[in-house]
Amino acid sequence: MHCRVLLALTLPFLCLNAMAQAPDPAAILEGARLSASLTKLEKGLTGSIRKGNHKTPVTLFLMGREIQFQFSENPNTPRIFHMRMGDSSYNLFEIIDGKSRDLSANQLVAPIAGTDLTYEDLSLRFFYWPNPKLEGSEDVGGQPCYKIRIDKPHNTPGRYEVVYVWVHEKFGAFMKIRGHNSKGGLLKEFQVEDIMQVADKVWTLRKMQVASHDPESGRRISITDVTFDSPNQAKPRGLR
């Protein structure tokens, strides 16, 4: 099965260094989802998501104030999805015959190409939930990060009730995400392993591991790897 995905996964990584320095959690998250710098990448970001031996090509694009991703088991009949940035409803839409249709609650949590990533994960829609709370600073992989808690608004669909996000204090890129259920059980963890510079003071994801967990035992069930290539204009610089 050969699949191609246009997704917004790395969009919240892109930010200016100054935005991440503010100790206000709303400002930190706003900086983490800034997209203006993505317009500097005319061809977007290309890479892949891989689970086991199956690899799915991925490409990230920004269309004005909309982030879009495309998934298709058949390259000739792609399915296109989008979310408008700053939309307080946090809804994802599928474009069918030129018209936007809401994704159902079940579709939001459906896996993409058999991986640990869902449509909810690809859009990182929880970054748009209101009233984030700063819980302090912690190191992630030896890197100083702000730890932010985001609670799901009432009557909002999705698996996660509480999401914790660790944002790099210097680069402004998120370094780790943990999604929990209503009982506090860990459902999924996103662990960034490397970032890269794509423009002046703009950093984005190079490599990340996404792991699904058993919320009762905390045991890791399965893993998906996400990797992006360096743009031609980028001068990559890893964390380690």
Segments predicted by a language model, with ranges:
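Ribonuclease/tRNase effector modules and their secretory precursors
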Residues: 47-48, 70, 81-86, 95, ...
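Gly/Pro-enriched, hydrophobic low-complexity segments
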Residues: 144-238
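Short hydrophobic/aromatic-rich beta-strand segments that constitute the beta-sheet cores
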Residues: 67-71, 89-94, 102, 174-179, ...
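Short, exposed beta-strand/loop patches in secreted or surface proteins that constitute
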Residues: 57-63, 81-85, 131-137, 193-196
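Bacterial N-terminal signal peptides
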Residues: 8-17
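Flexible, processing/modification-adjacent segments and terminal tails
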Residues: 21-31, 37-41, 86-161, 237-240
